[in-house]
């Protein structure tokens, strides 16, 4: 039995079976490449669901991690820390928002944004107590905690977890008339992924986000953009909402915010929204900890200094155009923006992902029939050509 087989066996024996990973063990990683314990090399075309936009173990991020780890790693929010204010300033100036509230995981940040929206609805908009509603979209993925699960339209994400939370309405993604029909006097917010990731890289119709912005302005409703996966350069823009030149009232960021090293997430908004939180009304022991802030400061610097949004736009256009040239009866559609691309098939995607793994290319199926490609944004054109050769070979 190989070392990889031993690891997989003990993992399956002791671990809850809530994941079905590809049968590969990753023991080393650098840039866009990973290795298994046997020394086999693979190209990472998933980036931990966009958490590794800067590439594995980016030297600037690792250096920031090491330097901070030698000083202080955690103090809780009971005390001030040296670099939280610096990180606040950087992320607020980058987003154009006045206030930031840090958490750890994406789901925590979504929960935080929903709490802010509800409290804003009661304290600012004067919706009657316990009547606030939030509109979300079919096909959404906002996390695995109870509020995001209650928002989901995926039966398996909800099965056995009832009673689900109330106060949510769901409409079809891309249907502006459905959004109009769902808005009423109790609507507090519209929560949307500017590009739906888990649903299969679903890109909204051109101008759709602008229409939502206009509806929110007309009805005094908060526009909440979940940019956890599509943001921070992944779509070819710094924020995926930039494709429609709109600014949401609330940004939710995570994943690449931690540079593929530590979990850190944030809710960004102006004083009117985040000002609803008072001392004791929300919190997180690890949220905004010194180690995460140091890592995130470096992660943001890499995104800007290396123009990762621009790289994603240029290389994504090339990659998508080359994928569209592949003529195979199983391919239904190629879609995406930047280096955030899905190949929708008319059959199961898993066997193709397994074949690509055998070719040295790691990716993951989503919603059964879509192959998702989201490589680190530091990838070179030559490395993309390597990936294209492997993709072409499995469709021959």
Swiss-Prot record:
Any one GO molecular-function label of the UniProt entry: ornithine aminotransferase activity
The organism's place on the tree of life at top rank: Bacteria
Annotated Gene Ontology cellular component terms: cytoplasm
Annotated catalysed reactions: a 2-oxocarboxylate + L-ornithine = L-glutamate 5-semialdehyde + an L-alpha-amino acid
The protein's enzyme class: transferase
Main location: cytoplasm
Record PTM N6-(pyridoxal phosphate)lysine, positions in chain: 255
Keyword set, alphabetical order: Amino-acid biosynthesis, Aminotransferase, Cytoplasm, Proline biosynthesis, Pyridoxal phosphate, Transferase
Cofactor(s) in the UniProt record: pyridoxal 5'-phosphate
Protein name: Ornithine aminotransferase 2
Natural source organism: Staphylococcus saprophyticus subsp. saprophyticus (strain ATCC 15305 / DSM 20229 / NCIMB 8711 / NCTC 7292 / S-41)
Gene designation: rocD2
């Amino acid at each position: 039995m190989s070392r990889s087989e031993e690891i997989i066996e003990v993992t399956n024996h002791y671990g809850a079976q809530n994941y079905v990973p590809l049968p590969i063990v990753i023991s080393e990683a650098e840039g866009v490449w990973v290795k298994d314990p046997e020394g086999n090399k693979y190209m990472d075309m998933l980036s931990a669901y966009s958490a590794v936009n800067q590439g594995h173990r980016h030297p600037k991020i690792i250096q920031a991690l090491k330097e901070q780890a030698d000083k202080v790693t955690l103090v809780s929010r009971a005390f001030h820390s040296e670099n939280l204010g610096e990180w606040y300033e950087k992320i607020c100036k980058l987003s154009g928002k006045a206030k930031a509230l840090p958490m750890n995981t994406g789901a925590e940040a979504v929960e935080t944004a929903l709490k802010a929206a509800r409290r804003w609805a009661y304290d600012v908009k004067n919706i009657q107590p316990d009547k606030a509603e939030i509109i979300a979209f079919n096909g959404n993925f906002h996390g695995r905690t109870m509020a995001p699960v209650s928002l989901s339209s995926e039966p398996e994400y909800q099965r056995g977890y009832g009673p689900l939370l109330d106060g949510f309405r769901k409409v079809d993604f891309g249907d502006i008339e459905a959004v109009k029909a769902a808005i009423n006097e109790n609507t507090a917010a519209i929560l949307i992924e500017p590009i739906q990731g888990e649903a299969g890289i679903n890109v909204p119709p051109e101008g759709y986000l602008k229409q939502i912005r206009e509806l929110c302005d007309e009805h005094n409703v908060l526009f909440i953009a979940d940019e956890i996966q599509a943001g921070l350069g992944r779509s070819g823009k710094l924020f995926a909402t930039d494709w429609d030149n709109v600014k949401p009232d609330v940004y939710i960021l995570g994943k690449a915010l931690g540079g593929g090293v530590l979990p850190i997430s944030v809710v960004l908004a102006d004083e009117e929204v985040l000002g609803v939180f008072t001392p004791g009304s929300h919190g997180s022991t690890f949220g905004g900890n010194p180690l995460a802030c140091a890592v995130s400061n470096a992660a943001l610097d890499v995104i800007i200094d290396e123009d990762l949004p621009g790289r994603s736009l240029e290389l994504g256009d090339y990659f998508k155009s080359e994928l569209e040239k592949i003529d195979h009866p199983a391919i239904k559609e190629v879609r995406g923006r930047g280096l955030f691309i899905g190949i929708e098939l008319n059959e199961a995607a898993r066997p193709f992902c397994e074949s690509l793994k055998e070719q040295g290319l790691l990716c993951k199926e989503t919603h059964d029939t879509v192959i998702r490609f989201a490589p680190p944004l530091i990838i070179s054109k030559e490395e993309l050509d390597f990936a294209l050769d492997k993709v072409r070979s499995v469709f021959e």
